[in-house]
């Protein structure tokens, strides 16, 4: 969390992944306009694979989804991104979008459109 916080404070445009962030890191990203691409599918796609302890995978995913919801509630910028090609993350998969919609609830479309617009503006 400290490295993400430091990167945001230094003005980084976006952060990819970030499963173990805390409130200070989220706040720094929000205050500096850093777009977060949480790549939840890299965690979510591990469920039921038998490769890792299911309880551990569930706990990591739950924490990451809670952070996504908290960041959105702060007004943070979130954009979808899959890290396609990672283990169990095939190209063309929509699992990232489904997990983000689950984490963000009714506001998913609004939150994601703001994040995507900022990514397009920056890059």
Question: What role is predicted for each listed range?
Answer:
Residues 52, 61-123:
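His/Asp/Glu-enriched, well-ordered alpha-helical/loop segment
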Residues 13, 45, 120-121:
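Residue-level marker of structural boundaries
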Residues 6-8, 26, 48-49, 90-91, ...:
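Short Asp/Glu-rich motifs
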